[in-house]
């Protein structure tokens, strides 16, 4: 599959360009996002001061990639854009590394006034043979984790880690409801919550997913909207409109709802505002996580034996199959694409 060796001229007189295999957004289609997904040769990363190029060994899919194909966070003038936020691989010195995909958090490698972005919003992503990121964004991969496992952590698992431990403020023994078991963030929240000594409740429309949630450590898994045996201290919300009312109603007085996504839409029919103010509930938005939190998450997984839940591993040239499965909602855990 490798195309990174030769150098190809584009046209007579143009500079020669090194190319590589990549999976990319060629067009924006809000209704049929996969219509814009293509794979083939793209220019390899160019050398840039303060940036490093990593050879990708594994990269994982996120709903962010589907949203990008719909044009959310990805402007037409940035196309074609190589997709993929997450990756683990080997840097220019042969070190095994993991990428933190929030660019501009620190100003490293970008201008001081450049707003924060996630890979694929401004800069080419990880579904390729190579990716270039600010050197500051590269972390050592713990030897205990495989490339496939490590590639699951920087987006969905980091998001869940920040939601639980930074924004929900939960402690061992507290209770938490995770909506939408099966999704990448939700699955991570179940596993991390169990490992941290929380009582985890989960929901899913799918009986097989509810069963898997129990196997991962949830004390109870119910259908969306079902009454829980107790009011919970916190809710981890990524589904959005379809589960919002249930999330608010499931909280104890003074409880915290942390939301990082809205895969079912962002306009719930009932905002439950009266309940929010009367019970003094906290609603906290959460996006991704910091480099320090990713370091903590990597160490946590290495030390505890906690591992990401991987639904399927596919070679990168079969990325479309992975996108189709993610769009259908049939996943439990992460889909990982492997390089070579």
Functional labels for PLM-detected ranges:
Residues 10, 148-226:
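Mid-domain Rossmann-like dinucleotide-binding core that forms the NAD(H)/NADP(H) cofactor-binding site
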Residues 1-87, 133, 340:
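Short N-terminal strand-loop motif that marks the start
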């Amino acid at each position: 599959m490798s195309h990174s060796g030769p150098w190809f001229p584009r046209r007579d007189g143009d500079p020669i360009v090194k190319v590589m295999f990549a999976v990319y957004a060629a067009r924006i289609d809000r209704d049929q996002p996969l219509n814009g997904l293509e794979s083939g040769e793209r220019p390899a990363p160019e050398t840039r001061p303060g940036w490093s190029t990593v050879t990708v060994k594994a990269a994982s899919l996120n709903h962010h990639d589907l949203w990008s194909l719909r044009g959310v966070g990805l402007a037409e003038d940035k196309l074609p854009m190589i997709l993929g936020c997450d990756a683990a691989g080997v840097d220019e010195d042969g070190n095994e590394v993991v990428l933190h995909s929030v660019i501009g958090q620190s100003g490293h490698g970008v201008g001081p006034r450049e707003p924060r972005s996630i890979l694929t919003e401004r800069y080419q992503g990880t579904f390729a043979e190579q990716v270039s990121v600010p050197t500051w964004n590269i972390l050592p991969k713990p030897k205990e984790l495989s490339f496939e496992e490590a590639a699951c952590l920087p987006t969905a698992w980091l998001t869940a880690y920040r939601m639980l431990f930074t924004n929900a403020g939960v402690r061992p023994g507290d209770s938490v409801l995770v909506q939408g078991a099966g999704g990448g963030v939700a699955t991570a929240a179940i596993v991390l919550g169990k490992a941290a000594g929380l009582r985890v409740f989960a929901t899913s429309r799918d009986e097989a997913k509810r069963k898997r949630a129990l196997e991962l450590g949830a004390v109870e898994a119910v259908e969306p909207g079902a009454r829980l045996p107790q009011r919970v201290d916190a809710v981890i919300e990524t589904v959005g409109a379809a589960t919002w009312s249930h999330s608010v109603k499931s909280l104890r007085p003074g409880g915290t709802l942390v939301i990082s996504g809205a895969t079912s839409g962002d306009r719930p029919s009932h905002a439950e505002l009266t309940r929010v103010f009367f019970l003094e509930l906290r609603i906290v938005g959460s996006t991704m996580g910091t480099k320090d939190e990713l370091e903590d998450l990597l160490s946590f997984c290495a030390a505890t034996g906690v591992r990401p839940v991987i639904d399927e591993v596919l070679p990168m040239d079969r990325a479309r199959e992975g996108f189709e499965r993610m769009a259908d909602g049939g996943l439990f855990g992460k889909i990982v694409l492997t390089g070579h």
